[in-house]
């Protein structure tokens, strides 16, 4: 294994690896930010939920009005 470093300069190999990993991390984060589920900056966009309107009683009397 030590002979591989005779072919490649260790400093250039580590810098190239760091640049590659940084680029890969940025790419993955941008892909996740582009999705609705994993976008942690804007939060998940919730679809509007249709709700049924509950019937309200016709006449409501409070205790203050009853006195």
Swiss-Prot record:
One cellular component term from this protein's GO annotations in UniProt: plasma membrane
Residue intervals on the Cytoplasmic side: 1-12
Record carries keyword Transmembrane: yes
InterPro entries xrefs: Antenna_a/b, Antenna_alpha, Antenna_alpha_CS, Light-harvesting_complex
Keywords: Antenna complex, Bacteriochlorophyll, Cell inner membrane, Cell membrane, Chlorophyll, Chromophore, Light-harvesting polypeptide, Magnesium, Membrane, Metal-binding, Transmembrane, Transmembrane helix
Topology class, membrane: Single-pass type II membrane protein
Regions of this protein lying in the Periplasmic compartment: 34-67
Bilayer-crossing regions: 13-33
GO BP term, example: photosynthesis, light reaction
Superkingdom field: Bacteria
Main subcellular location: membrane
Pfam families documented for this protein: LHC (PF00556)
Binding site for a bacteriochlorophyll: 29
Gene Ontology molecular-function annotations: bacteriochlorophyll binding; electron transporter, transferring electrons within the cyclic electron transport pathway of photosynthesis activity; metal ion binding
Subcellular location: Cell inner membrane
Protein family membership: Belongs to the antenna complex alpha subunit family.
Subunit structure, interactors included: An alpha/beta heterodimer. The core complex is formed by different alpha and beta chains, binding bacteriochlorophyll molecules, and arranged most probably in tetrameric structures disposed around the reaction center. The non-pigmented gamma chains may constitute additional components.
Function comment: Antenna complexes are light-harvesting systems, which transfer the excitation energy to the reaction centers.
Protein's name according to its UniProt entry: Light-harvesting protein B-870 alpha chain
Organism, scientific name: Rubrivivax gelatinosus (strain NBRC 100245 / IL144)
